[in-house]
A protein has these predicted regions:
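Short amphipathic alpha-helical interaction patches enriched in hydrophobic/aromatic residues
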Residues: 44, 64, 89-92, 231, ...
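Ferredoxin-like iron-sulfur electron-transfer modules
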Residues: 10-32, 45-48, 61-84, 266
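Conserved aromatic-histidine-acidic binding/catalytic patches
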Residues: 28, 89, 93, 160, ...
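Alpha-helix capping and helix-loop boundary segments enriched in small/acidic/polar residues
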Residues: 28, 47-51, 192-195, 199
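Iron-sulfur cluster-binding cysteine motifs and their immediate structural context
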Residues: 2, 31, 35-59, 76, ...
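Secretory pathway export signals and precursors
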Residues: 26-32, 36, 78-84, 88, ...
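Iron-sulfur cluster-binding electron-transfer modules in prokaryotic oxidoreductases
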Residues: 3-8, 18-20, 98-373
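Residue-level recognition of short, well-ordered coil/turn positions
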Residues: 35, 67-68, 87, 113, ...
């Protein structure tokens, strides 16, 4: 891609200017300083200004003011090419909430029939749990039973983990059996919000918050960030963060061939960049294994929700340097704290024939307890 966006310029003046697609305050915050460029995975791959946060905000401004027509192909391409990792937010001196702008952009670009068919299918299925059951995607044992009190913290069963990785929730409950698992849980709406339907994403988050009492604990970093945005950070905790705050002391050690296992971490982008949670998973891993900080652990793995399905070649281009770093680190395990990352890493490691295994944080800690017995 070599298409250049309109050159960065001052924001449009005056109230009521533009189409009303974006939060004008957020658009106006961007001062086009370029601090975001090195943090952006797609800009690092292409060196293309249009594929940077600064360039994309310039495109958003051009769409808002009518400088670019709504059907301009660069708008469609760049709104899709962005991973939505929000790494740019952590280095932005102006405090631009880029993730919010991206959701608004995709609300426009992916409205109605313009939404990719696979996104339409997935969002329809996860918003209707009975469809998951009908299609056999949720196994009978996928919903574990917790032993917590009705008004205690609730373990939220993520849509993806419920169907593909039920062992993660079971491991979480072995570690914290006091967690309550209310029946009838629905989708939190993160998938919708990130894929052009932020209104449904908000409604589903609020509905889930009303259905589940107390603190919501989730084993998915992306769900945690989405729920915290709509329900408030005091009501939502990612599982590792919950363990850390509750003073959980991991038991046992993870061993491989009689030695302490070497374990690295793949950060969840939204957990790290959206909620600022970085220490808890590292400290928990270090308590049961030899923790190895892999270069680029905080960089996106290329999963990015539906991105790996919509743009597999671009997703692999983001993942491949990470796979090389994992191989160089000679790990026994790499830990993920988000189901999309877990899937991405497992597929990549399998493709390259690596000996490293990708596991969820809850699974690693449960494995340590098993080794103790």
């Amino acid at each position: 891609m070599t298409t250049e966006p309109p050159q960065p310029g001052p924001p449009a003046e005056g109230p009521g200017t533009g189409r009303g697609l974006f939060d004008k305050e957020q658009l106006d915050r961007c001062i086009s300083c370029g601090f975001c460029l090195p943090a952006c995975p797609t800009y690092s791959l292409t060196g293309d200004e249009a594929s940077s946060p600064r360039g994309r905000i310039t495109l958003m401004r051009a769409l808002e003011t009518g400088e670019l027509p709504a059907d301009d192909p660069t708008l469609a391409e760049e709104s899709s090419y962005c991973l939505g990792c929000r790494a740019c937010e952590t280095v932005c001196p102006a405090g631009v909430e880029y993730g919010q702008l991206l959701e608004q952009w995709r609300d426009h670009q992916w409205s109605g029939p313009k939404r990719p068919w696979i996104v339409r299918l997935l969002t329809a299925v996860v918003a209707r749990p009975f469809l998951l059951r009908l299609q056999g995607l949720v196994r009978r044992h996928a919903r574990p039973s917790g032993g917590g009190s009705a008004d205690g913290p609730s373990l939220m069963l993520g849509c993806v983990e419920r169907g593909l990785y039920p062992a993660v929730s079971r491991a979480a409950l072995r570690l914290r059996p006091e967690l309550n698992v209310p029946p009838g849980q629905g989708c939190c709406g993160a998938l919708h919000a990130h894929n052009g339907d932020s209104a449904t994403g908000k409604a589903l988050a609020e509905e889930l918050g009303a259905r589940l009492p107390g603190t919501l604990v989730t084993t998915a970093g992306g769900c945690a960030a989405h729920l915290a945005h709509h329900l408030g950070p005091d009501r939502v905790r990612e599982f590792g963060d919950h363990l850390h705050r509750e003073g959980h002391v991991p038991a046992g050690r993870v061993t491989v061939d009689g030695r302490t296992a070497r374990v690295g971490l793949q950060d969840s982008c939204h957990l790290r960049n959206g909620l600022g949670v970085t220490r808890p998973p590292r400290e928990l891993i270090a308590a049961v294994a030899e923790y190895v900080e892999v270069p680029g652990a905080g960089d996106c793995c290329g999963a990015a929700g539906t991105y790996a399905m919509l743009r597999p070649a671009d997703s692999r281009a983001v993942l491949d340097p990470k796979l090389a770093a994992l191989a160089e680190a000679d790990l026994d395990f790499v830990v993920a704290v988000n189901p999309g990352c877990l899937r991405q890493l497992r597929q990549g490691l399998r493709r390259t024939g690596a000996r490293t295994r990708a596991v969820h944080l809850a699974e690693l800690l449960a494995l340590a307890e098993e080794d103790r017995t």
